Structures are given as structure tokens and as C-alpha cells.
Amino acid sequence: MSPSSDVADGDTGTGDLFADPEDYYPPTPPPTFQTHTLASGRVLTLHLVGYSPTEAHHLWNGSRVVSDYFEAEPSRVQGKTVLELGAGAGLPSLTAGILGAERVVVSDFPDVDIVMTMQKNVDEAGDLEGVVVPKGYVWGADVKPLLAEIVKTSTEGEEKKEEGRKFDVLVLADLLFRHSEHGKLADTIWDALARKEGSVAYVFFTSYRPWLRHKDLAFFDVVRERGFLVEQVFEKKMEKPLFDGDPGDLEIQKTVSGFEVRWPKELLEEGKA
């Protein structure tokens, strides 16, 4: 059959000449898991996606330290509504649920694998169904879908959505290295944090790139410009850096810093107006 006949039949004769070889792109690494032991001795298995450009395939030190911070004083989350941003495995959310939070929304980028992995961690925790809810969320976007997950169980066992409720507690663990997203994170705190006394956003982080620590800390300038109060409340030196062999000051790489972001009195009063 002549080449012209091939073209007439819709076959250009090139076959797979321009197709990428099967091994052209490296395969996505398989999912992994890590464990975390609570103060009670309970061991949580934390599944992670094999790889994500949003870094959801790591269990960050900030997540472990926030979890410990909640365990040290359970009243920080007991009976409260909690939203975790950029959660990955969602360890702080699981811990909050175990400690008696009323409702926890564990959120990360709306990638199917990430959300399904968060759901798997909730399911395997065993007793958090109806308490911890995974959601896909892009920082700075409309928070209404997150707020819609705040529910209260009545004495009859029926769940009733409470209009106008926001989150008592926000968790931001190891998110500040995404410098371009600081404004969007501040927007979400503004929109999602309940405007009442006692509401707080816990921002824990390590400067994994020590030479850019000033850019990590610039997040707090952004939230101060919005009118929030900022206070450092915690610091812990880990035994070793999360990533072996990274350049820069090892002591900074081992340090987890914890800050609280709260509403000032004048903005609380403005919210009541």
C-alpha cells in the first residue's frame, strides 16, 4: 500500500515516532507512611502520598510539635472547632479530634490523592468519624465550604448546621516557606477565624532554608498589617534536622518555632457591631 493510501485512510505513517518512550518520565514514588506516638502511648499510622508538588509527601516537624503542644494542654482544642491548613497527613487534626475537639476540618490542596490519603488517616484512627472531616481547599479561596462543615450534634443525634459560626482554632504547621502565599494564608485566617476572645491561629514552623528565615518571618509582618496580634509562645530544638545533608545552619534547621495569631480587642468589638 502506498504512503498516499495510508494518509487517505487517516494513517500518517509516523506510528509512534513522536510518542514519549514508556520510561521517559520517572514513575511517581509509591505512597509511604510514618508513625507518631501520642503521650498516652497510642500509635497513629500516618499515610502520605508518594509525591506532591505541594510537599504533602512529608510529615513535617511542625505537625509533630503542634500535636505535642495540644497534648500538653488539651483545653487548647477540647470542645472547639478546628481548621488545619496545608495538612498533608493531618496529624494535628487527628490529635485534636482524639483530645475532644467538637469538629475538625483537615484541609489541603484539592488533589484527589491527597484528600483520599487524609480520609484514610481519619478512617484508620478508628474513632474520629463525624469529628474530623477532610476537605480540599486552596489558600485564599472562599471559606464558605469549610465553614459549612461546622456542625453541632443535638441531643437527638441530629446534626444541625449553625449559620455564621467560624473556627475557634486554626493550625498552620510548616507552611511559611511558601513566601508567595503569605497574603493568601492571611486572607484565610481573616475569613475563617471566629472573631471572639480566645480564638487563635497556631503557626508553627522551621526555617528549613536558614538563609531565607527572614522571608519566613515576613509572614508575621503580613498578619500584623491586617491588624492581628502576634506572639511567639514556643520553641523546641529537635535532635536532628528533618532533611539530612541540607545546606545552611543546622541549629536553625532543627528549631521549631511556635506563634499565636489573635484578634485585637478593637477588631473583636468591630465584629460585634
Stretches with model-predicted labels:
Residues 1-273:
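S-adenosylmethionine-dependent methyltransferases
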